[in-house]
Amino acid sequence: MKRPAIVMACLLLCAAALDACLADSPEPAKQAACAEARREKLKVLRGKADQCSTLSCWSPWLRRKWTTDKNSAKPLSEEELAAISDEYCAVLKEMLDLAPDEAKIAFEYGDALMFSGKYAEAERVYRRVHETCFAGSRRDAFKIAQSEYRIAEALFAQGFRSGAKDQLKTLVDRKLVTSRRGVEDWSAYAKASYDFLSGAVPCATELPRWTGAKAFPEPQRVEYTDDFAPLSEVSVRLVGVKRDDPRVDFLVRRLAARGIKAAIGGRCPYSVTLSIDAKAPVERSEGYTLEIGEKEATVRARDGQGVLWGVVSFIQCLSDTERAVRICRMDDWPDTARRGYLGSCIWSGCLEFTIFCKMNSVVLQDYPGDSGRDTPLNVFQCTELARQFGAFGLELYFGISNYTMGLGWAYSWAGTLSMHVERCCHFAQMGANVYYPNDDMRYPVHADDTAKGLNASDVDAPHVLALYNAVREKYPKFKMVYCPPFYWGPDSSAAYPDDREKYLKSLRILPPELDLYWTGGQVKGYNKCKRQVEWFTNLTGHRPVIFQNGTGAHNLLSYLVDETDWNGWHYPGFFENDIAAFHKNSHTPNECVQISTLGDCLWNVKGYDKRRSVERGVAFLLGEDMFSILKPGLEGLTRFDRYKYGDINADILYDDLDELRKAYETASNCWAKAVAYNPEVQVYGAYGRGVGFAARVLAAAKNPPDFLAKYAQYLAAARAEAVKETAFDKEKGDLMYLPTDMSGPQMDFYKHPNVDEYRFVKFIRGAQTVFSASEMKFECDPFPPAGDYELYVAGMDDEVEGLNDIELSVNGKVFYSGPSGFVPRKYTMKKFRIPFDCMERHNKLKIRNLGVGANANGPPYIAIAYVVLKKTGENSSR
């Protein structure tokens, strides 16, 4: 029996059972039977709906329209697609009749109707869900926002633009927080859609909140005075700049927002001249000269981008309190050609923020319609953003991860290429570009490819090249950045079933203008050396585009006022000469402060000052006083980093709870003041979450778990290894320390990709982290000791070239500093001698990693499996 026939038979049986239940009296037993029959019917219908959705609507893996016929490059016909969509809608309607309160089914049904072009019916379904949001006392903010945004989508699709705008305004005014990892931020999408419909973008925000009347990023050459020129009315004069240039409108609207009347041409007390001049003083691309005098200001540049950055600097030099501008002069240009970030979603201030940070390259990984949900409103929003980015001369890329990562299609199928071409053309016709990730979800390679003896290193590059050429043929200005699956190198492991160097060499067939991301362990690990960059460049024939990951100092989170040592992580010349572009992977707008500091560094590498930069970034987004409000609580809040996201570990047994409580109270008070000063602080950074983590730690510390019991199975194996490798003998007074006995939170039952054995270890990270040392306490008995102690340490070094040095001390007295003796990818045991005169009755042994690094989640590190102390009876000082 074929699958459709089986499904139909199951449906008939379930329907019969359900009808029988409904015909009888509602006794408890029969009510239960009816409920079970209803669940069974829903289960069968769910299977049928899933069958339909793989070929229609917005399914998770985007098989929309495309058959899985390996020999076909054609999609389903409109007639076939319509038939499947009609069946899908019918099944979902039946499901909703059975479960009328299931919002998930209702949203899916409404989406299916939207996909089928039945917009009015979809609106009715969405409104039905919306009504249930207000039934009872509990309000589900996420469901309210989701239903109201979808209602606006349906209205817009029917041509009711004004009605859609009003619906979006209603949602915006609710100020609901719907930012969640991995799901749509409906409130952010609503605000962006409303602002685009209102024509507010690119002036939808109040940025900059405070500049101190100085340019940002730090100019290359600048002469500031303490004098200001009054501005009441301004005439804008244009030389080589068109009247309808968006840079001109941007300046006029920004002046108007400060209460300064501005007009193009005419005679006013003050004039601003914007000039594209082949003989402008700064010869560099995007460079400009800005001169601000008592009666006039002039921006001179050799290209439109230079004019834009000169306009931005003029706006930043406006007084924060008066209608005036600082008198100054600057010659300025960027050190790094392409500067930007990977954002997590569209938000209303995306374009403005990018402009004020003088960045020019942005990738949006999540956006309305990123799963193929191309409703007219979502397409409008993406198209409008792409249009405005293009008008300002900035690069905008949309990610297509739902079409590439974990797709499950063979690259040798003709339909795979056709589907990718269609999706890329969808964005290219907007004037946007595409980010194509294979990243860490490329494997396993499809069986139809491996059956032909093909691996990813054989098929990926030709596929990407064919895709790129097909789109460029239609849209010659189209750009692409491709993220291959092989992480970093040459130091980190090649963890995928392919030859890493063969794969990277295969990318040489891609043209130089098709960019390649370079990501993985060591990019997340911050520090990069020239040898590594040359390795990638030589293999691929491309300078890398950096996909900078994991920059948050607090278990990957940013607490807003942290300093970021961008220059410390990179060698001289890296930003200026050796890369094609630098993008920071970010949760936006949450991480905008740190992104602003990156923009500062990429613009003026040598002039970057990490303290000044974060102060100005915070002020730019949140106001002059916000940094000083939050900063006093940062140090104490950092103490809680050892308890990742508020989960306690064995370190709580070593910690001072009174000090932790004081640190929490200080940070909590700072946060309360910050929210009162500017509630928008809740949008940026994770300071508030950090306060919440601290509260969880203190609550859990009142009744900590039995850590020995929690890790019992790991500890038994670790203890056996220590006994075997050191001849440990408790009867002789030997002392053993396993990861639970060592301070520091980072322990794991760990297997390095290139090491065949698992071990329970404590990680000691780089010297610039809060996890750079681990302590153990021991009693010297008898005291004074008869002689020295021997220290046995089993550990492994990280995979990065060059071994970590360590420092060993007892009670603050250093008795060893130098190479650890540990090696990469193999556990070894090393012996050290502790001089007897270092010891007291009660002692504190500390192992510190001296390896330079600030990454709390990657290299440099040493992994410690155990520590054993033995009495020697020998006195080394004699």
Place the predicted regions along the sequence by residue.
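Acidic, contiguous N-terminal accessory segments
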Residues: A23, Y194-Q305, S313, C317-D331
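Substrate-binding groove of N-acetylhexosamine-processing glycoside hydrolases
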Residues: C57-P60, L197-A200, T211-T225, C425, ...
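Glycan-recognition and processing domains
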Residues: A204-A213, V723-F783, G853, N857-N875
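Aromatic-lined carbohydrate-binding surfaces of glycoside hydrolases
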Residues: L342-L516
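Beta-strand-rich ligand-recognition modules
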Residues: K751-R759, T769-A773, P784, G795-L869
